[in-house]
C-alpha cells in the first residue's frame, strides 16, 4: 500500500492546480465550468469522452444519490452533478487528490452537491443501502481483493441500484511495461481476466445488464502519437509525474493485448 500511496501522491496539489489554471488563461476567482477542467480532472482511460459514454449507459437520474469510488479529482462527479443535478459522494484514498477535488468543487460552485471522503474502497464509511447508483473508472486495477471491493459496493447500494464501471482487465499475455498510469511496478498491478471479473461480480450479488470490451474502439479513436499538453494547457501532467511514459506504456500494453479495456452496468439484486 505504501507504494500505491506514493504512486498517487501529489504534493502541493492545490497550488499546482491554481498555477496551471492561471497559465491556461482561467481565472480561479471566477466561476469555472466542469468543461473548463476536463483535460485535468478525468484521470482514466478515454478521459471526458469515456465518462460521457458511461453516463449515457448508467441510467442515473437527478434524484439519485451517487457514489464515485476512487474519485480522483472528482471530474466525473462534477460532470454528473452538473449534467443531472444529482448529489455525489466521492470516496478517494489519496489525501492529495481529496484536497484537489474539494478545491475544484468550490471553483465550479458544485461543493453543495458533492461531498469528498478520504477512505478505502474495501471499508467504505457509509451505511448499508445508502446510494441509488455507484460509479467507478479505472480503480479496481489497484485492488487485489476484488470480492471484498464488489461486496462493499453491493452493500452500500440500495436494492436495484446500478453500478457503472470502466476497468482495465488482464489480456492474454502478462503485463510487462511499467510504469503505468495506475501502477509504478507489478506490486500494485492487480488485473484479472474478464471471466474472473464477471464471476466475482455475479457472486457479489450483481446482475449484469451490460458488459462490453471497448479496447479496439478506444485505440481507433486515440492517436498513437498524441502530443502531451503544451505549456500553458491544462493536462494530467499537473499532478501525474512521468505521464508521457506511463501513457505510452498503457497504450503499448493495450495494442499488444496485455490488457483490455471493458465497461459495464450491473444491477444490485
Language model features with spans:
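A short glycine-rich, Lys/Arg-flanked "PGG" loop and its adjoining helix->strand segment in the class I
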Residues: 147-162
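A short acidic, Gly/Pro-enriched loop at the edge of an enzyme's catalytic core
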Residues: 122-133
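Class I SAM-dependent methyltransferase SAM/SAH-binding core
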Residues: 65-69, 73-123
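Conserved Class I S-adenosyl-L-methionine
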Residues: 210-269
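N-terminal auxiliary segments of SAM/dcSAM-dependent transferases
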Residues: 1-24
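A short SAM/SAH-binding and catalytic strip from SAM-dependent methyltransferases
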Residues: 133-145
Amino acid at each position: 500500500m505504501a507504494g500505491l500511496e506514493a504512486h498517487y501522491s501529489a504534493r502541493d496539489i492545490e497550488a499546482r492546480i491554481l498555477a496551471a489554471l492561471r497559465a491556461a488563461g482561467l481565472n480561479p476567482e471566477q466561476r469555472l465550468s466542469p468543461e473548463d477542467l476536463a483535460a485535468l480532472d478525468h484521470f482514466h482511460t478515454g478521459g471526458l469522452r469515456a465518462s460521457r459514454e458511461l453516463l449515457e449507459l448508467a441510467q442515473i437520474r437527478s434524484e439519485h444519490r451517487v457514489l464515485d469510488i476512487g474519485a480522483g479529482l472528482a471530474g466525473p462527479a462534477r460532470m454528473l452533478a452538473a449534467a443531472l443535478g444529482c448529489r455525489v459522494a466521492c470516496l478517494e484514498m489519496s489525501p492529495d487528490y481529496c484536497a484537489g477535488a474539494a478545491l475544484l468543487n468550490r471553483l465550479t460552485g458544485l461543493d453543495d452537491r458533492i461531498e469528498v471522503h478520504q477512505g478505502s474502497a474495501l471499508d467504505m464509511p457509509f451505511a448499508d443501502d445508502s446510494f441509488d447508483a455507484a460509479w467507478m473508472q479505472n480503480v479496481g486495477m489497484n485492488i487485489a481483493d476484488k470480492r471484498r471491493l464488489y461486496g462493499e459496493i453491493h452493500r452500500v447500494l440500495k436494492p436495484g441500484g446500478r453500478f457503472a464501471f470502466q476497468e482495465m482487465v488482464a489480456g492474454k499475455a502478462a503485463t510487462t511495461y511499467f510504469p503505468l498510469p495506475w501502477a509504478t511496478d507489478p506490486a500494485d498491478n492487480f488485473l484479472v481476466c474478464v471471466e474472473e471479473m464477471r464471476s466475482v461480480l455475479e457472486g457479489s450479488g450483481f446482475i449484469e445488464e451490460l458488459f462490453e470490451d471497448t479496447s479496439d474502439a478506444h485505440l481507433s479513436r486515440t492517436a498513437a502519437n498524441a502530443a502531451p499538453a503544451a505549456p500553458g494547457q491544462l493536462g494530467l501532467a499537473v499532478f501525474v509525474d512521468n505521464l508521457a511514459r506511463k501513457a505510452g506504456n498503457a497504450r503499448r500494453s493495450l495494442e499488444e493485448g496485455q490488457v483490455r479495456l471493458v465497461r459495464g452496468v450491473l444491477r444490485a439484486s
